[in-house]
């Protein structure tokens, strides 16, 4: 199959890139022509990821890695400096790093685990954004691709840290998108669908007693019958990093359910509406009149 190199010459920083969706995105980016900086906390897995991704790269592409904790300001500052030095510039940030955090009733989950999950999922997105935006503003161009999840749009009882933090980063991305729209910077979030990754394994290992019987059964069924392929979310990440998506910003886009391949044909409608955003639903949105004052 011929891969269209829509990211030819572009440079990307991808967090949480040592496994799962982050690794799939890294591979897709290199196949699309980009040079990449991969970061994660596990140096050993990161080295393995570098080898796998580099095997897909052409001679003129760079595949660099750096161990970093994206929730630690000094780590992120050093990561940004290394990225600019080793890649020679940067056009794309993919914020993929994230964790489920503790699972169980909110009154009994471990508080340190809860705050750590919130730190990784929220600050681990804010800090890389803060690091890249001065560079993006100076060059008046950039792409920020934020990974979201089911917790952003639906309640996830007993997976509170994940749900709350995912909702937070979607609103973060939308707010930053408005703030930087005059600099040619696009900021979008991806809902990748249910993925058969380490995080799914953690959820199933926690068991029904931790995550609730109904949710556990639904996830176990998905794991057996078919989750969303990693390549689907990775392909959307490529699209949102490419010139084809220029001007599409502030959106939460579902990789398996939205017709994202043709969103560039609807830039005007997107820019003038709240399509693909988080909003409060009022009665009239459901053809009810009793809610109007």
Segments (PLM) and residue ranges:
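Conserved glycine-rich Rossmann-like NAD(P)H-binding loop of the short-chain dehydrogenase/reductase
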Residues: 32-48
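The beta1-alpha1 cofactor-binding region of Rossmann-like NAD(H)/NADP(H)-dependent oxidoreductases
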Residues: 43-44, 67-79, 111
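Conserved mid-core segment of classical short-chain dehydrogenase/reductases
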Residues: 77, 100-115, 138, 158-161
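C-terminal helical subdomain
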Residues: 189, 211-293
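Active-site helix of classical SDR
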Residues: 129, 165
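Catalytic Tyr-X3-Lys loop
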Residues: 107-126, 141, 145, 169
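Active-site-adjacent segment of SDR/Rossmann-fold oxidoreductases
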Residues: 154, 175-185, 244-246
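Conserved glycine-rich cofactor-binding loop
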Residues: 11, 18-19
